[in-house]
């Protein structure tokens, strides 16, 4: 497990405005909890605590949305 920005397809973070949205998203993916980190290095994005290793996370590089 690790603490990290949970990622969508193409290395994109989940944008957020509310902690509750991120907490729900993170816990549904097996994390202990989550919150919305405002003004972080990837903008306003969901950060998960104790996220399982099989769940994608944001890695170095750009978001490659099609």
UniProtKB/Swiss-Prot annotation:
<dbReference type="InterPro" id="IPR018218">
    <property type="entry name" value="Scorpion_toxinL"/>
</dbReference>
<feature type="disulfide bond">
    <location>
        <begin position="16"/>
        <end position="36"/>
    </location>
</feature>
<keyword id="KW-0872">Ion channel impairing toxin</keyword>
<keyword id="KW-0964">Secreted</keyword>
<dbReference type="InterPro" id="IPR003614">
    <property type="entry name" value="Scorpion_toxin-like"/>
</dbReference>
<dbReference type="GO" id="GO:0006952">
    <property type="term" value="P:defense response"/>
</dbReference>
<keyword id="KW-1015">Disulfide bond</keyword>
<comment type="function">
    <text>Alpha toxins bind voltage-independently at site-3 of sodium channels (Nav) and inhibit the inactivation of the activated channels, thereby blocking neuronal transmission.</text>
</comment>
<dbReference type="InterPro" id="IPR036574">
    <property type="entry name" value="Scorpion_toxin-like_sf"/>
</dbReference>
<keyword id="KW-0800">Toxin</keyword>
<comment type="similarity">
    <text>Belongs to the long (4 C-C) scorpion toxin superfamily. Sodium channel inhibitor family. Alpha subfamily.</text>
</comment>
<dbReference type="InterPro" id="IPR044062">
    <property type="entry name" value="LCN-type_CS_alpha_beta_dom"/>
</dbReference>
<keyword id="KW-0738">Voltage-gated sodium channel impairing toxin</keyword>
<feature type="disulfide bond">
    <location>
        <begin position="26"/>
        <end position="48"/>
    </location>
</feature>
<protein>
    <recommendedName>
        <fullName>Toxin Boma6a</fullName>
    </recommendedName>
</protein>
<dbReference type="GO" id="GO:0005576">
    <property type="term" value="C:extracellular region"/>
</dbReference>
<dbReference type="GO" id="GO:0090729">
    <property type="term" value="F:toxin activity"/>
</dbReference>
<keyword id="KW-0528">Neurotoxin</keyword>
<dbReference type="GO" id="GO:0019871">
    <property type="term" value="F:sodium channel inhibitor activity"/>
</dbReference>
<feature type="disulfide bond">
    <location>
        <begin position="12"/>
        <end position="63"/>
    </location>
</feature>
<feature type="domain" description="LCN-type CS-alpha/beta">
    <location>
        <begin position="2"/>
        <end position="64"/>
    </location>
</feature>
<dbReference type="InterPro" id="IPR002061">
    <property type="entry name" value="Scorpion_toxinL/defensin"/>
</dbReference>
<dbReference type="Pfam" id="PF00537">
    <property type="entry name" value="Toxin_3"/>
</dbReference>
<feature type="disulfide bond">
    <location>
        <begin position="22"/>
        <end position="46"/>
    </location>
</feature>
């Amino acid at each position: 497990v690790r603490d990290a920005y949970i990622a969508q397809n193409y290395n994109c973070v989940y944008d957020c405005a509310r902690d509750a949205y991120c907490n729900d998203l993170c816990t549904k993916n097996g994390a202990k909890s989550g919150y919305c980190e405002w003004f972080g290095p990837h903008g306003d994005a969901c950060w998960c605590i104790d996220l399982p290793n099989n769940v994608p996370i944001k890695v170095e590089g750009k978001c490659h949305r099609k």
